[in-house]
Amino acid sequence: MSSPLEKREAASMERRAFLKQATLATAGAAMATAPASLMAQSSYKQPQHAPMELGLLIKPSPDPEAKIRLVHELGFETCFLSLDGYLDHFTPALTKQFAGLLEKYQVIATTAEVVNPQPLKWNFLEGPSTIGLVPRAYRQARLDALKQCSDFAKSLGIGRVQTHCGFISEDPKDPLYPETVAAITEITRHCAANGQSFLMETGQETPTTMLRMIKDVNNPALGVGLDTANLILYGKANPVDALKVLGPHVRAMHAKDGKWPTNPDKLGEEVVIGRGEVDFPRVLQMLHELGYQGAVSIERETSGPQQIQDVKEEKLYLENILNKIRNA
């Protein structure tokens, strides 16, 4: 009869073999080349920015000049590009347009993101079956979208690609888990071939599950995009505690605030930075101590004049914290 230790070792070996088999099943597509028409041109060279430089998340479509100009007018030097509006329309002409606008307004694009194609239901009832790379029905289409995003980002010299990977199972024996490992392995390899990191945005999964995914994919190009509010909005973790688990893997950050969910069907409420549950002084201090080199990109999910007013307030709030950290 096997001892308990032998049984645990056998189970661990079986799980590793299962993960390897699932990963190899799709890894062959990971090195797919970019469209020749897009990648034949010279890549735009992004300037360097200071560690923890403030930035703004923008959705450039349909008017990229207005959005990039706004970044400059609000006093930011970096931006995080949400590019869903351009899926299936990434072209050399678009690269040239974006490169010209970034140069014109002296803005550095730090990270590119897509989450589409639809459907995407941002709640607890339908989110698990619609968001990210976990749901089988949408996985391949989203892998294709992420590869498009990666190739376009490469043409602009952007070194990070990010998305929500979805409600990754807490149970590594769930059949969806190794399939998700394989999918994340595939897109991570594609990004690595483009000289980029692939970042899993925090939110739908616990920090421990995200750490397990990092270890199971086992590729240095895989990292974390920390969204401070999402951890709270989805009820998964306090961002301070999440950094204790994921801190060394964080390569991008959304500065966003929110409150814990009190309705089991709906996410918590996003609020202006400084009015929610995120302890920004502690989070930013921890990132500083970890040697974080990325930007601090404000994300405010309102729109119009109210969004601009909110962002101005949030910028001042974060600048005050960052100045204290730098001058300590």
Per-segment meaning from a language model:
Residues 52-58, 79-81, 109-114, 161-163, ...:
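Hydrophobic faces of well-ordered beta-strands that scaffold small-molecule active sites
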Residues 2-33, 37-53, 64-72, 207-222, ...:
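Histidine-acidic metal/acid-base catalytic patches
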Residues 71, 117-129, 261-265:
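Short, flexible, mixed-charge acidic loops at enzyme active sites
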Residues 57-61, 84-86, 114-117, 166-168, ...:
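Active-site beta-loop-alpha junctions enriched in small/polar residues
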Residues 93-97, 176-184, 236-242, 276-279:
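Charged helix-capping and loop-helix junction motifs
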Residues 47, 68-75, 90-112, 150-157, ...:
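Acidic (Asp/Glu)-rich catalytic clusters
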Residues 82-103, 165-172:
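Glycine-rich, proline-tolerant flexible connector loops at the mouths of alpha/beta enzymes
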Residues 22-35, 41-46, 62-66, 104, ...:
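Active-site acidic/histidine proton-transfer and metal-coordination neighborhood
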